[in-house]
Amino acid sequence: FWRCALSALALMCVFSVKAQPVNSANMDPYLWLEEVQGDKALAWLRERNAVSTALLQAQPLFADNRAKVLEVLNNRDQIPRVTRRGDYLYNFWRDAKNPRGLWRRTHLEEYRKVQPKWDVLIDLDALGKAENENWVWGGSDCLAPDYNRCLISVSRGGADAKVTREFDIAKREFVKDGFYLPEAKSQLDWVDINTVYVGTDFGPGSMTRSGYARIIK
């Protein structure tokens, strides 16, 4: 008897529950933060960054730690990290004299020396000054096997969105009418000297909600 009564009561409870409409705003009061480029989201970001920066700078060890980190970063005796391409070792170097950095290369024999000589390919501080831009290095992709043509990416102030241009190492200049992608969260990769894969904003539906390329052409 009791088992039947409890079963009937449970069944009545199931049918008596009324479905409630789903309100996404009530479920997540911060849903507007998903608009990564929205004015409200960016304003909130700047506000929270200011609060966090003030808290960090108020710490007793902040100034001392900052000075020590800068000393390490600007130490010219640190071993440069390199990428080998053909006969050359490539490195991107930043220090107090070159805050935006130098993209440079050298030979293995020279690299083994205590004070190697470097061939500077791009001075990012000079480039930014010449173009009146706050360029931050985004990387290089050079075409094998001779590695003479490279796709150089830079961003404004270190943003995720980058500008990509084709660079001629032999001439030490960007290629006139060469491969170029305007500022976007994009990707450009070599196929051959005349062809590249492109992932960028091709119009409606070509980008993810976070602003990255959904389509490669």
Task: State where each predicted segment sits.
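Beta-propeller folds
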Residues: 6, 15-217
